[in-house]
Amino acid sequence: MSKKPLILGIETSCDETAASVITENDQGKPIILSNIVSSQTDVHKEFGGVVPELAARSHIEKIDLIVKKALDDSGIKIKDIDAVASTAGPGLIVCLSVGLSFGKAFASSINKPFIAVNHLEGHALSPKLVSNLNYPYLLLLISGGHSQYLNVQGLGKYKRLGTTIDDALGEAFDKTAKLLGIEFPGGPQIERWAEKGDPNSYDLPKPIINKGGCNLSFAGLKTAILKISKTIETEQEKFNLAASFQKTIEEILKKKTKIAFNEFEKQNDIQGKIFVVAGGVAANKKIRSMLINLCKENNYQSVFPPIEICGDNAAMIAMVGLEKYKLKLFNKLDHPAKPRWPLDENALFLKGAGVKL
């Protein structure tokens, strides 16, 4: 029996310091041996958002311990690691540089291959950590830095169907939470506040809802929230605005996902249609429920990665590393960090297409 590859993954693209070790079974299914994520919420809380320099400093302080814990938890010895995969972009350049430099040095020190991973590709392939998915599938990536519809055709083969033309959905959640007085990161709390409010209290705008194909826009919605928040006087009004915001997001995603279904079907002549949702906002239960029902109505299989691999993590980075390792797709140690690194290099450049991070 041949030795199965053991891949160390490292992720420091924003405000999570993460490391993971994965391998695969005899059927080629990935097995997560460890997946350690250290959040920096307390570091950035008083500033109401991520401060790049503080994030990078925190990565530098933690990276060695996080990688050591990932190795310890996996029960794997350093000498048995077959390759090191690190996020090289997109992201905050000062943060990317920490994990990328550490990964290169680690790989060099044990004389093993180094693999540079696109953070978005990690999200795109993350469902394969827990599901036996066949290509192609339609992916909705919704996170703090990215909001995209992608036709995932295979490793390294992606066609962008739509993206945000301004702000990412996760950013819209966090900014709305901040305006309502919710502590950073407030995005996840919006859903809980929404449960206490009336979703019909405010008629909020749905930018480019009837144009732009699969493209998304949230800046106008964010501006409307800003104006209304200045008039709010009671806690119940805050709950009502949170509920109205949540409802509006669901309506936008429902309409745009229907359009994405049509675009995906035009590009792929297949029987089994699969819709995958990944990224931190995929943890929102109301959005999940709405999209699951939409899939049932349109004969799509819906796939949501577990909550622990929806947000930024290193298991998804190691997953891409594993796929590339088997194809001997290695990188040189001078591979640069890329603050902007779209999956679909041929897609039209848009401001929101992976630029903000």
Residue locations for each model-derived region?
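Conserved phosphate-binding catalytic cores of ATP/NTP-utilizing and phosphoryl-transfer enzymes
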Residues: 1-5, 116-138, 320-321
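Glycine-rich phosphate-binding loop plus the immediately following alpha-helix
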Residues: 143, 154-198, 222-233
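Glycine-rich phosphate-binding/hydrolytic loop that grips phosphoryl groups
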Residues: 123, 305-344
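Short glycine-rich phosphate-binding loop at a beta-alpha junction
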Residues: 78-88, 267-281, 303-306
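Conserved phosphate-binding/catalytic loops in two-lobed NTP-binding clefts
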Residues: 116-117, 274-275, 292-317, 331
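N-terminal beta-alpha supersecondary unit
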Residues: 5-80, 86-90, 119, 123
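Short beta-strand scaffold segments in enzyme catalytic cores
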Residues: 17-23, 125, 139-141, 147-151
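A contiguous, well-structured pocket-lining segment that forms one wall/lid of small-molecule binding clefts
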Residues: 35, 192-275, 282-298, 325-328, ...
